[in-house]
Regions:
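Basic- and hydrophobic-enriched, low-structure N-terminal and domain-boundary segments
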Residues: 1-154, 162, 406-408, 424
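Glycine-rich phosphate-binding loop of nucleotide-binding enzymes
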Residues: 124-212, 462, 510, 541
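P-loop NTPase nucleotide-binding module
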Residues: 155-175, 378-390, 433-434, 439
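Hydrophobic residues in beta-strands of the RecA-like P-loop NTPase core, especially within AAA+ ATPase
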Residues: 189, 414, 453-454
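P-loop NTPase motor domains
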Residues: 193-199, 203, 224-435
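Conserved ATP-driven motor cores of ASCE-family P-loop NTPases powering translocation/secretion/packaging/pilus
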Residues: 228, 437-522
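Conserved AAA+ ATPase small/helical "lid" subdomain
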Residues: 237-264, 498-528
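Conserved P-loop NTPase motor module
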Residues: 505-559
């Protein structure tokens, strides 16, 4: 039971108050507990005054001090979280009267009230419990959580994939009425083929059924995909751009005035084979000099001279021809990519397919060749951002007084985000960085937000990572990553940040605009789980030798 500290029976008292710390002296620590639970670092205390206000603080550290008479007392330092006043919790502790009169461990009801009062039931979204007391659920404000960008960081084995799966599973299962599907739309970029098992009803896309229209690439993406961007060859650029515009205009069926306005970024079809044929022709171009041979075997024939680009486009032609003939790129350059419409592409990405309407779309990128990974992510991300932009424009045009810009908002989830948007200026990452940085800066206005998950946050583009307003920081062991995350989090977190190195699997520091106060939480287990379990090397190695079908591996490799 709680020990009531009175003037006659003073077991604990406040001896110092600082802006970010309260120092408490406890005479008998064994009596300073509640419900027979001993205090520990991370436990909560309540400090009362005569104004019916109760300061709630979390214990950060303690010391044992020996007195001259041989007895000992304990000095506890606690970080003030906020004040309970009239049964309601308020952030901040500067309204407490000095000196406080009463110190005791906080009750479970005190702790629950901190979190339960922070958000209404309609806006609450809960996926974790307090790590120090699993009976206390820790909700976040669902609107502030999802309409601001989110970051999940943690070393391998910290529970990052399970946390991501838990959040998405709970988001798509919440319903405000009696219907089958809620209105959530989540697109997961799955680079390691982990999440299909966690979302068995998802709209699943991999290289076997992924079709992206290459002709919808913008100018930067086209250059990165087809040109040797490091070579800085103006000839190949000019021929490439000119051939695309020429073929688009040739295939355009509209007015001549509209035809002349077609440019490299026009979202109109062009035939990549026609571009290749043009490049070959220019590379072999011979020009008539206007003279004829007067004698010999060529008598009467026109004299020809090599064109200005003769032989200068050989590398470009070979590169382009190699891509067109590369079967691994059929999802981008195959026959289907020439006939798929914009509507079909968008429907498949946001779960509106005729055969399977789904809240979650998983884009399995494990089979996408690394050299086109950035382009693939860039095109999909840009299309989804532009969907949000156009949808808002149409919605506001039809409803001038509408306050909700987008009533079908989407969440883009980037697993291992440092592989798409690294903190690097290399040209091979330029397209994906440009697309995702634009979403990070402007996406919220159009109902398109990000969830970035990474084990190496220090390698993510700082422009993108700094836009996140909600952080789920799990165990981080790399000092560089620890320092990077600490730099982005508020200084007022005190020792909570230092605990990142010792968090157990599934534990996380939850901080951001959506939660009433930074907290160490235990993330709920997802069900079903992603296939991210470690391979049991030692158990497998001890089993009997297994034969492998090398021919089957070769066939799949060469497919």
């Amino acid at each position: 039971m709680a020990v009531v500290t009175t003037a006659d029976n003073l077991n604990a008292q406040v001896v110092a108050v600082f802006p970010d710390k309260v120092r408490i002296v406890v005479d008998k620590l064994e009596d300073f507990k509640i419900a027979e639970e001993s205090l520990r670092v991370g436990s909560y205390v309540r400090i009362a005054d005569n104004e019916n206000a109760v300061l709630i603080a979390i214990i950060e550290n303690f010391q044992i001090v020996a007195r001259d008479d041989g007895t000992r007392h304990h000095i506890i330092e606690a970080f003030p979280l906020g004040v309970l006043r009239d049964g309601k919790f308020e952030r901040g502790g500067d309204s407490l009267a000095i000196p406080p009169k009463n110190v005791e461990p906080a009750t479970i009801d005190d702790i629950r009230r901190i979190y339960s009062d922070s958000v209404s039931e309609a806006q609450g979204f809960c996926f974790s419990s307090l790590a120090s007391n699993p009976e206390v659920r820790v909700p976040v404000n669902g609107n502030k959580f999802f309409n601001k960008h989110i970051a999940i960081v943690g070393s391998t084995g910290s529970g990052k994939s399970h946390t991501l799966a838990t959040i998405v599973q709970k988001a798509v299962s919440e319903k405000a009425g009696d219907f089958t599907l809620n209105n959530s739309h989540v697109i997961v970029f799955d680079i390691h083929s982990e999440y299909k098992s966690a979302f068995p009803n998802a709209n699943f896309i991999d290289v076997s059924n992924l079709t992206l229209p290459y002709w919808m690439l913008n100018s930067e993406e086209l250059e990165e995909f087809f040109l040797d961007t490091e070579a800085n060859d103006h000839n190949q650029r000019n021929v490439f751009k000119g051939a695309i515009i020429q073929d688009r205009r040739a295939k355009f069926q509209g007015d001549e005035s509209e035809r002349q306005r077609i440019h490299l970024d026009s979202p109109l079809f062009f035939d990549i084979q026609a571009v290749l044929d043009t490049a070959k022709s220019r590379n072999e171009d011979m020009i008539d000099t206007g003279e004829t041979y007067q004698s010999g075997a060529k008598k009467g024939q026109s004299k020809l001279t090599q064109g200005s680009l003769f032989g200068k486009l050989t590398n470009f032609v070979n590169r382009l021809e190699s891509k067109v003939n590369d079967r691994r790129l059929d999802f981008f350059l195959g026959e289907r990519s020439k006939t798929i419409t914009f509507e079909q592409t968008l429907e498949s990405l946001i779960g509106y397919t005729a055969t399977n309407k789904s809240n979650v779309t998983i884009i399995d990128l494990s089979g996408v060749p690394f050299e086109v990974l950035s382009i693939t992510v860039s095109l999909i991300s840009r299309l989804l951002f532009e969907y949000g932009y156009i949808y808002k424009r149409l919605r506001c045009a039809n409803n001038p007084n509408e306050k909700v810009n987008n009533d079908v908002p989407i969440l883009l989830v980037y697993e291992e985000a440092h592989k798409y948007v690294p903190n690097s200026e290399l040209s091979k990452y330029r397209s994906s960085k440009v697309s995702i940085e634009r979403i990070a800066k402007e996406g919220r206005k159009y109902g398109v937000t990000l969830l970035l998950a990474s084990q190496r946050p220090s390698e993510i583009s700082e422009t993108i990572f700094s836009q996140c307003s909600n952080f789920i920081a799990m165990r981080l062991t790399n000092p560089v990553d620890q320092g990077y995350v600490k730099k982005l989090l508020p200084d007022s977190l005190g020792t909570l940040i230092d605990k990142m190195t010792s968090l157990r699997q599934g534990e996380a520091l939850l901080v951001g605009e959506s939660i009433v106060l930074p907290s160490i939480v235990q993330i709920d287990r997802c069900n079903p789980a992603p296939s991210s379990n470690d391979i049991p090397y030692w158990e497998l190695w001890k089993e009997e030798w297994r034969d492998m079908d090398i021919e089957a591996i070769k066939a799949e490799w060469y497919r």
